[in-house]
Amino acid sequence: MSSELMFNYTFSWPAGPKDVILTGTFDDWRGTLPLVKTAKGNFEITMPVKLANKDDTFQFKFIVDGVWCVSDSYKKEHVSEGIENNFLQITDLVETQEVAGASRIPEAGGLLCGKPPRSAGPPSTSNRKKNKRNNKKRRSKLKKKSTKNNKKSNESLDDNEEEDGVTGTTTEDVTGTSREETPLAEPTNVSKEAPGNFHILPIDQSADTTQSNGIIGGPGPVLVPNPGEIKEFTEIRDVDARELNERLNKKEEVPEPVAGPIVESSVTEKSPALPQADDPIVETKEVAHNVQELTPQVEAVTPLINEPEPLPTPEAQISIPESSKVEPVEGSLQSKLVEKRESTEGVLDGSKKVENKAKKDEEVFTLDPIVNKAPKLPLTDEQTAEGRKSPAVSEEKEKKKKQEKGSKEVKRSETSKEKKPSAKEVKKQTVKASKKQTASPLSSSTEEPKKKKTGFFGKLKKLFK
């Protein structure tokens, strides 16, 4: 066993500073043991102090907020070169030494934990006196509340107490006797303990290790050093739900006006319907087609004129303007033209019909230059007018008109037998016929009233009128 001496000693520093560190020969003056701040505000720490012998001293010093200083509550020692330190001797350690046998916490640098158990001994008489006083109080209460029947029970209690006084024991004294029977704990010497059993935890000086909670129950409120710089403490937003919804809805409605392509597509969709207005063009094509069909007939008629191709003689020149040779050609052409005009009356107006007539007449009489007869003279306007106004031609036309009218009247009589038109319908038909005659006075002589189509739907309309 070594001759080293070890004692537990509590170092303290008064309240005021933020950080206090203990250093000395035990850690080669490195400042590795900070003091703990208590609830009172002062700093304390209990640690084992080793002495090589009785004459040896324990030198130490305090580092308060980074400044090395000496405490006035401990002995001071001047070292060479004007350095001053605190120190402890064996006498100082023995005075503060606690009872042997106290348990230590090695993780806390050998700090004491609790006091040794109380040594067992004879029971004290103070417990008996207290029990007797309590019993007397109980008696007085029971006497006030009890009746005659309860007096017997009180007497029995008195008898029991007298017996307890004779024996000198109570229920509590029994527990004391059991404590007496327990063996005594063997006292232990602090000097016999191994010196290297206590561990000192290394501490980083850069860390602020002295921060402690002033409130025992918890950490308490946090006080921020710069509350003005934190946005959460200054900025407060009051948002109105209605205004926010209106603003968001307005932003969403902005893309709705950008529906330009949709409008253009509608225009393009409607554009194909424009050709419907060009229906008259189709009608003119049909008329042109009908005219083209007439040209072969006219060409077929021309050989009648060009059958004999003799040399030009004065007799032939005189025979050309005769109406007898031209009459059958004109009559056949006019009859065919009249029939085809009747088929196209429902489509073309009166003005168009007159124009088409003039064109067809010109085409018929412009065919004369095709004949390869040099000596023949072309017909003049006067001769053509005389041919048209000839009585033979007019008589034939009137006969044909009468025949056509008779056939149409027969057909109408047959249809009228099937359908009995009302007086209103007859009036309407007469009014329409008069309107047609007034609209086209030139064609009234050659054209006949249009034949009405009588279909199923037409019959229904007439019935509902």
UniProtKB/Swiss-Prot annotation:
List of residues that carry Phosphothreonine: 182, 295, 366
Main function: Cruciform DNA-binding protein which exerts an enhancing effect on the cleavage of cruciform DNA (X-DNA) by endonuclease VII from bacteriophage T4.
Keywords: DNA-binding, Phosphoprotein
Lineage: Eukaryota, Fungi, Dikarya, Ascomycota, Saccharomycotina
Name this protein carries in UniProt: Cruciform DNA-recognizing protein 1
Bias (Basic residues) ranges: 127-151, 451-465
Bias (Low complexity): 166-177
GO process terms (BP): signal transduction
